[in-house]
């Protein structure tokens, strides 16, 4: 029951944000972002504005914005690994922890792997005003 409500809510937000985002400028990846780790697993696509990041046996990949943003639009198309994925966490998150190490804000979308035959689980975390001890965590 809650899974369906969550998916309807998420879909509604995506549709709303998608409609509002059509007039926003898009920054080229090289102009607005820097690689954090896993350079071999990060490929800039032909349009120069999108990237394909991947996960192999040793590492994933990540990048960070070169500027601060007070608001904006973001999206991700995530394909999760198949088969046995226990211990694998695929995450899409935003944080200002590089600027505020002891008092940061964070929004996480984490996909938690599982044993063969079991579904992936999604976990969301929201921390505000440095409340890393008292955040909002939901698991579906």
Predicted regions and their residues:
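GH16 jelly-roll
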Residues: 1-140
């Amino acid at each position: 029951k809650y899974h369906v409500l969550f998916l309807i809510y998420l879909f509604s937000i995506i549709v709303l944000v998608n409609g509002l985002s059509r007039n926003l400028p898009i920054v080229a990846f090289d102009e607005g972002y820097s690689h954090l780790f896993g350079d071999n697993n990060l490929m800039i696509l032909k349009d120069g504005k999108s990237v394909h990041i991947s996960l192999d046996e040793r590492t994933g990949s990540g990048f960070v914005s070169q500027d601060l943003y007070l608001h904006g639009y973001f999206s991700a198309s995530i394909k999760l690994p198949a088969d046995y994925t226990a211990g694998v966490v695929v995450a899409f998150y935003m944080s200002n922890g590089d600027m505020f190490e002891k008092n940061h804000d964070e929004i996480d979308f984490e996909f938690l792997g599982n044993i063969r035959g079991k579904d992936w689980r999604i976990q969301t975390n929201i921390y505000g005003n440095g409340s890393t001890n008292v955040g909002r965590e939901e698991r579906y």
